[in-house]
Amino acid sequence: MDKIKENAFVKKIGFNSLVLFCILILLYILFAVLIPVVNSDANANFVTWAHILSAMNYACFMGFLSLGVTFVIATGGIDFSIGPVMFCAALIAGYQLTTNGWPLALCLILCILVGTAFGVLNGLLVTYLGLPSFITSMASMMIAKGLGSVFTKTQPVSWPQLSDASGNGWYRNLVRMQVGGMTVPTGLVLLVIGAVICAIILNKTKAGRYILCIGSNREAVRLSGVNTKGWETLAYILCGTLAGIAAIFYVGVYTTVQPGLGDTFNNEAIAGCVMGGTSMTGGVASIGGTLIGVLIMALLQEGIMTMGLQINYQYIITGLIVLVVVYADLRSRRRRN
């Protein structure tokens, strides 16, 4: 009976997600043991709340990017515009806040609307005009980078600090908040809530089932009378909306936004998604896996920086991990076929 219950538990949470969680714990232990050996600095102690908070700061905005692109990849598509779209949303909304004096709440909503607009654009171009998602998202990436730069006249935009006299710094509490003298990673809490909502959409709704079916066998779904264009467009809209939400958390962490950037976040978001078990060929996706994949990415970045190494090492390790994961996914699919 106990074994049956155990198997049911593993099946419910997903075997791959369970394996990823074990990898996350082992990675943390590895860094905790290795960092004091590699880095003799007295401050190079990985087992501190400060390092955990730093990793969570990165995870909270990267997580929303990865959750969004999970929906697109589930359809068999790709979106390389999410990073620049996040920056574009933060630049436009921040410019309206600091230059034109718009209310902070309205600017936060504007972040989401800008991201959603790019999602609608990408979805319509891919589904109704039949453009390849790779080309479409590359074009949107350039448009987002250019639009943000033109809007701000190529100048960086600085969002208010928490201590700002205007009182507009409260949005930073969305990322971290002081409670009884302790810093709480509220961004991670909100990310988990967002992941639960995304998991419900993907696994418990008609929209999610159609998105996965489109990625698995688009033609069969179309012949069954389903509006594949509409559901696929929805996947891109969700991706854009979540990129807009990610912009809010990004400025909550870094405050200052530079125009013309954001490309590297595309690769990191997609890597977290793929690492979490979402198939690049579509039809298979795991929101829980994506969340853990992002946490692994965050831990990897924080660990490498604490070791005193350049961030480029993270790119090398992440690239190798993605190659292994994609290769394993292709081998698994060939065996099933």
Predicted regions and their residues:
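Hydrophobic core segments of alpha-helical transmembrane domains in multi-pass membrane transport
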Residues: 20-33, 69, 112, 141-146, ...
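Single transmembrane alpha-helix segments in multi-pass membrane proteins
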Residues: 31-32, 48-100, 125-131, 277-287, ...
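Transmembrane alpha-helical segments in multi-pass inner-membrane proteins
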Residues: 236-237, 243, 253-318
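Alpha-helical transmembrane segments within multi-pass membrane transporters and channels
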Residues: 101-141, 292-293
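Transmembrane helix-bundle core of multi-pass membrane transporters
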Residues: 7, 134-137, 141-204, 231-234, ...
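Cytosolic-side transmembrane-helix boundaries in multi-pass membrane proteins
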Residues: 1-29, 33, 196, 216, ...
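Helix-loop-helix "hairpin" substructures at the membrane interface of multi-pass membrane proteins
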Residues: 102, 107-108, 118-122, 181-256
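Membrane-interfacial amphipathic/re-entrant helices at transmembrane-helix boundaries
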Residues: 2-64, 100-106, 337
